[in-house]
């Protein structure tokens, strides 16, 4: 089970939002590269970056912080990034800079042709982030709920060559209320590509529950507020996940 620390970037700093609200942000660090090194040293095997300003602006905004993170840990562990990725040039620049995966969210739903082109041009590097509430997909930093069913869209994206799906339950994100295991497993069972759980990770109990469903296709989990608030010790959680997997 991949435990993936999240580093959310706003104005060059590491922050956490509550339910995607830019006005409800808590700053957890002024030095994103140092934060990346901290998680790598704690045993992280992948990092999850979000360019929050970019997500809302529709274009990359935290380039200096992202570059610093890649310089610090990019040669040690894979790094994935979402937020503001709307064109092929942006993807190419990020991959050339050392990013392993780009995460396409809103643009995948609103501009499926772009996602198709991205999968063709950068096969193996494209992850789709699907944010949902009650099984329906949301877009635009969660501000708009669509009529699309998560499973239907994910199957279509799988056919186009997406590497994996990050599934976020937006009713739970940043709330420490527990991962929506049932919905995550339901999606994973409908697909042949891996699903990464996100939204609401509260503590070790969630990690243990996720390890039980790893064989269903749940490859990992994004670790956000819980590892910053102290509700989850990241190194201990990764060690426990490895123990449960018999690693």
Swiss-Prot record:
Principal subcellular localisation of the protein: cytoplasm
Keyword set, alphabetical order: Amino-acid biosynthesis, Cytoplasm, Histidine biosynthesis, Isomerase
EC class name: isomerase
Active site annotation, chain numbering: 8, 131
Gene Ontology terms describing biological process: L-histidine biosynthetic process; L-tryptophan biosynthetic process
Annotated metabolic or biological route of this protein: Amino-acid biosynthesis; L-histidine biosynthesis; L-histidine from 5-phospho-alpha-D-ribose 1-diphosphate: step 4/9
A Pfam family the protein falls into: His_biosynth
Reaction(s) catalysed by this chain's protein: 1-(5-phospho-beta-D-ribosyl)-5-[(5-phospho-beta-D-ribosylamino)methylideneamino]imidazole-4-carboxamide = 5-[(5-phospho-1-deoxy-D-ribulos-1-ylimino)methylamino]-1-(5-phospho-beta-D-ribosyl)imidazole-4-carboxamide
One MF term in the entry's GO annotations: 1-(5-phosphoribosyl)-5-[(5-phosphoribosylamino)methylideneamino]imidazole-4-carboxamide isomerase activity
Keyword Cytoplasm: yes
Membrane-spanning residues: none
Name the record gives this protein: 1-(5-phosphoribosyl)-5-[(5-phosphoribosylamino)methylideneamino] imidazole-4-carboxamide isomerase
Organism: Acidovorax sp. (strain JS42)
